[in-house]
Swiss-Prot record:
This is tRNA pseudouridine synthase A. Keywords: Isomerase, tRNA processing. The active site is at D52. The gene is truA. Formation of pseudouridine at positions 38, 39 and 40 in the anticodon stem and loop of transfer RNAs. NCBIfam families: hisT_truA. One of its GO terms (biological process) is tRNA pseudouridine synthesis. Its EC number is 5.4.99.12.
Length: 244
């Protein structure tokens, strides 16, 4: 038996997220169906996590087991011939059977992109949140610094989040202006459902002058989701890399 690790890039616009669902097409479903067509066997992917509908990935990690005696390169090349244009295998490698992409992950890097311009851009509408008003970068950067470290992120998660613990450690949270885009990078040990999107929504409130950056430690300590910013729309979010 072999354990094949895939690094997957996808545009999540047309999908109901990563994970298999009964009432919608998902990225996992499309890849599994392509693998079954290629290998002639039933395949179940095990991933490093999940992404919601409309969220993208540059570095989703997933593994599957097979007894097929094919060169590793054949798995990525074969899949890329079968997959639709919005899903691609960036790399394939053979890993120990014990490798678990979720349990063995040390940290993850997410990026949230805001297109900050008075004019809308058709070319960025599927991978960024369009905001017309001016955002104060200095205040957003100050706000971002308060998320670094180990905190209880109960106030920065979806209402239906069922995580056993809401404690997470953030190694790096930054805000940068690149042309008309505002880039929020978040690198942490793990994430709650919608956590990065709520952090982004909160930092936008700071940039708009609706929330003082000094209020963020109180939000973290209070654990009240209603006191934090809105959940930023999904299309601005991208899973950049999973670290092992």
């Amino acid at each position: 038996m072999r354990n094949i690790k895939l690094i997957i890039e996808y545009d999540g616009t047309a999908y109901c997220g990563w994970q298999l669902q009964p009432n919608g097409i998902t990225i996992q479903q499309v890849i599994e169906e392509s693998l079954e067509k290629m290998l002639g066997q039933s395949v179940r992917l095990q991933s490093s996590g999940r992404t919601d509908a409309g969220v993208h990935a540059l570095g989703m990690v997933a593994v599957f087991k097979t007894q097929k005696d094919l060169p590793v390169r054949a798995f990525s090349d074969g899949l890329n011939c079968l997959l639709p244009p919005d899903i691609a295998i960036r790399d394939a490698s053979e890993v120990p059977l014990s490798f678990n992409p979720r349990a063995d992950a040390i940290s993850k890097h997410y990026r949230y992109t805001i297109y900050n311009s008075k004019r809308r851009s058709p070319l960025t509408r599927l991978n960024s949140w369009h905001l017309r008003g001016i955002l104060n970068m200095e205040l957003m950067q100050l706000g971002a610094s308060h998320f670094v470290g180990e905190h209880d992120f109960a106030a920065f998660r979806a209402s239906n989040c069922v995580a056993k613990t809401t404690i997470r450690r953030m190694f790096h949270v930054s805000v940068a202006k690149v042309g008309d885009s505002v880039i929020i990078d978040v690198h942490g040990s793990g994430f709650l459902k919608n956590m990065v999107r709520v952090i982004a929504g909160t930092l936008v409130a700071v940039g708009q002058g609706k929330l003082d950056p000094s209020a963020i430690p109180g939000l973290l300590a209070g654990g009240d989701r209603s006191a934090s910013g809105i959940t930023a729309p999904p299309q601005g979010l991208c899973l950049m890399e999973v670290f092992y």
